[in-house]
């Protein structure tokens, strides 16, 4: 009986943990990812036009997806490491 209870507790903890964790890439190059904080359940990639041929890329976690503009292209997604 104790083994069954322990198993149920472990399964519950694992399931609860998976319920709110999102992993998003968070560097300009798509190599390193981080676990998003609670409440930020979307990944974001923002490409910012600096000069005619120069762009900055920002990746990370977000709770809302801002709109794109003429100089900023925003892509949001809701699966792990989807902001490549």
UniProtKB/Swiss-Prot annotation:
Gene3D superfamilies: CD59. Keywords: Cardiotoxin, Disulfide bond, G-protein coupled receptor impairing toxin, Secreted, Signal, Toxin. Coiled coil: none annotated. Disulfide bonds join 24-43, 36-61, 65-76, 77-82. SUPFAM superfamilies: Snake toxin-like. Residues 1-21 form the signal peptide. Pfam families: Toxin_cobra-type (PF21947). Expressed by the venom gland. Belongs to the three-finger toxin family. Short-chain subfamily. Aminergic toxin sub-subfamily. This is Beta-cardiotoxin CTX23. It comes from Ophiophagus hannah (King cobra).
